[in-house]
């Protein structure tokens, strides 16, 4: 849709917009609560230095903090949702800016709590629990803070580290400025001979071109820019890795990875098991890349050939009007109680469907504890947006069940778990479409969508996770992370993952230079574990495993009342073992087998 044909926000039919009145009736009501929230936040500073006044007083402090957090979260949710629906609205811009300012004031006002709690001797805190039974309600919340006692420094050292925060973040800030503001990519000759400005946005689209010359030029010209700045980019990334290792060392962790995984109480064995299990099954990815090479009729498959469509235009489309029925049918294995939540999403206007001028791009699930779990879309009538819809509804159902079954303090859930709920829905949709359609072209398209999903999320994100850990280990051992060292080792790793059918040349060796996730401190592995767990659950739910379904719903209701690994064990999945990853790769193999067979039949 061109900019000229885009509706304004005022032109959007109300039925296709989300209903934000579950937050505030209007901006005046928002302002009235904002005034109250400012006073609540200001009052929190009076509790500083008082956590040694007994268990009952500690309960009072926690409740005051939670009450302020709830109100500020509500104010922020309304402001940012209003801004995201139309960023050109000046009133929304003001609301959003003021909400962020209030969030900063809240963070400053409660900054005393964790250090002060950690300064209490363990015996004192346990005495608080004994003398104040109502404090036991907050045991998990407090345990999650106090388990970091061994990694907490003195007050003066903590203050010093906090003051260094901006400096510690400077490698990523520098990379981001270079990558998003300073780099100037060339213009290339696009499809049909027209000039196309190469950008991060056009790069992905141009790699999908059916014209191999366009794909080659796009790839080579894109990496030419990174090659020009390879020394600087290596230095910036190296500094980021050194920062991770330094912070882990001063906090008495055995490694940067141990420090990063400590946040969610995830054993390091989960990470190692992912790398080992995926590494043992790379032959499946090699089969898939070899098949792509054959289908494209190429003597040599280059990295720029991995994204062009294998099957042409989609043989089926899905309209917004059809979406509800498809969602209800595809997610029927989740049971009537889950479908009631899906019905609420459509009937109660959780979803903001269509693009308009000023609306945020992409899709997400948002909201807060006592609001609707909203879904932002920019819907188009295609299969990708159908998958996006069920994905975001998976997040919203997770939020709805956590919020309705947990108190505010335990209602959130970790990133480690978040993608499981959303991707389980995607996998159920895949299963539904494969059961519904017997047309070979439709089945091929759905199978290809799934296979590409595993390639991009399980294999590719595991490759990133392996290289991220390799860099941290190399730096810890004193190896300089020069551009030569990074490029050659990344090229070798790429060859290991994609196999002999793909030419892993020096250009793809430079991919390390453009991956933002390498600055996120052991974040990226969670995409692969989450997708694998989701495939494990969806396979069993689709097969009618009622006991596992109930356990899975228990996970959706649990929020952060347990640590993520314990939540998954209770749901029937031990993520310290390799079984769930192997199960996912078996599904990949079975669908690859069918994909190959259907291709042979339709030749």
Question: Whereabouts are the PLM-identified features?
Answer:
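C-terminal, non-catalytic "cap/extension" segments appended to globular domains
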Residues: 6, 11-12, 21, 25, ...
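Short pre-active-site segment immediately N-terminal to the catalytic Zn-binding motif
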Residues: 315-320, 368-390
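Conserved helix-loop functional segments at active or binding sites
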Residues: 329-340, 363-366, 395, 399-407, ...
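Short beta-alpha connecting loops at secondary-structure transitions
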Residues: 374-378, 405-415, 444-453, 472-474, ...
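Post-HEXXH active-site segment of zinc metalloproteases
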Residues: 388, 399-423
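A well-structured
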Residues: 1-313, 598-603
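Catalytic zinc-binding patch centered on the HExxH motif and its immediate surroundings
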Residues: 316-318, 351-371
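Long, K/E/R/D-enriched contiguous segments that form extended
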Residues: 295-333, 339, 350, 373-374, ...
């Amino acid at each position: 849709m061109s900019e000229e044909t885009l509706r304004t926000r005022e032109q959007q039919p109300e039925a296709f917009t989300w209903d934000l009145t579950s937050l505030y009736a209007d901006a005046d009501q928002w302002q009235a609560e904002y005034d109250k929230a400012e006073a609540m936040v200001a009052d929190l500073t009076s509790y500083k230095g008082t956590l040694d006044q007994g268990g009952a007083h500690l309960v009072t402090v926690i409740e005051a903090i939670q009450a302020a957090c709830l109100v500020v979260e509500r104010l922020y949710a309304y402001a940012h949702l209003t801004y995201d629906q139309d960023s050109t609205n000046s009133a929304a811009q003001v609301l959003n800016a003021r909400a962020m300012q209030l969030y900063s004031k809240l963070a400053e006002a409660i900054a005393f709590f964790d250090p002060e709690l950690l300064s209490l001797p363990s015996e004192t805190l346990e005495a608080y629990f004994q003398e104040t039974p109502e404090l036991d309600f907050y045991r998990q919340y407090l345990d999650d803070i106090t388990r970091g006692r061994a990694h907490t420094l003195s007050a003066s050292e903590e203050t010093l580290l906090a003051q260094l925060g901006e400096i510690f973040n400077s490698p990523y800030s520098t990379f981001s400025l270079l990558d998003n503001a300073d780099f100037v990519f060339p213009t290339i000759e696009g499809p049909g001979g027209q000039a196309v400005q190469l950008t991060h946005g056009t790069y992905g689209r141009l790699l999908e071109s059916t014209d191999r010359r366009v794909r080659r030029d796009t790839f080579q010209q894109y990496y030419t820019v990174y090659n020009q700045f390879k020394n600087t980019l290596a230095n910036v990334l190296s500094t980021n890795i050194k920062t991770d290792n330094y912070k882990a060392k001063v906090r008495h962790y055995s490694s940067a990875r141990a420090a990063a995984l400590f946040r969610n109480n995830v054993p390091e064995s989960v990470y190692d098991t992912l790398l080992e299990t995926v590494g043992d099954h790379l032959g499946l990815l090699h089969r898939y890349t070899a098949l792509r090479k054959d289908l494209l009729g190429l003597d040599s498959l280059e990295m720029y050939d991995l994204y062009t469509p294998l099957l042409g235009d989609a043989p089926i489309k899905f309209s917004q009007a059809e979406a509800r029925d498809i969602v209800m049918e595809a997610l029927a294995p989740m049971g009537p109680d889950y479908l009631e939540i899906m019905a609420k999403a459509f009937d109660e206007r959780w979803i903001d469907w269509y693009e308009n001028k000023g609306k945020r791009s992409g899709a997400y699930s948002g909201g807060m504890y006592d609001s609707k779990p909203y879904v932002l879309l920019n819907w188009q009538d295609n299969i990708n947006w159908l998958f996006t819809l069920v994905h975001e509804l998976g997040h919203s159902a997770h939020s709805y069940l956590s919020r309705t079954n947990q108190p505010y303090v335990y209602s959130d859930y970790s990133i480690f778990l978040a993608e499981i709920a959303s991707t389980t829905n995607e996998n159920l949709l895949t299963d539904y479409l494969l059961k519904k359609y017997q047309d070979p072209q439709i089945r091929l398209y759905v199978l290809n969508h799934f296979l590409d999903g595993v390639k991009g999320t399980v294999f590719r994100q595991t490759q990133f996770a392996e290289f991220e850990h390799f860099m941290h280990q190399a730096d810890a051992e004193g190896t300089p992370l020069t551009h030569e060292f990074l490029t050659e080792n990344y090229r070798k790793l790429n060859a290991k993952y994609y196999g002999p059918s793909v030419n892993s040349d020096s250009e793809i060796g430079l991919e390390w230079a453009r991956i933002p996730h390498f600055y996120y401190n052991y974040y990226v592995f969670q995409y692969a574990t989450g997708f694998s767990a989701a495939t494990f659950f969806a396979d069993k739910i689709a097969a009618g495993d009622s006991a596992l379904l109930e356990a899975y719903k228990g996970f959706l209701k649990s929020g952060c009342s347990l640590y993520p690994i314990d939540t998954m064990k209770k749901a029937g999945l031990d993520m310290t073992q390799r079984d769930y990853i192997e199960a996912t790769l078996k599904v990949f193999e079975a669908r690859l087998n069918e994909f190959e067979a259907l291709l042979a039949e339709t030749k």
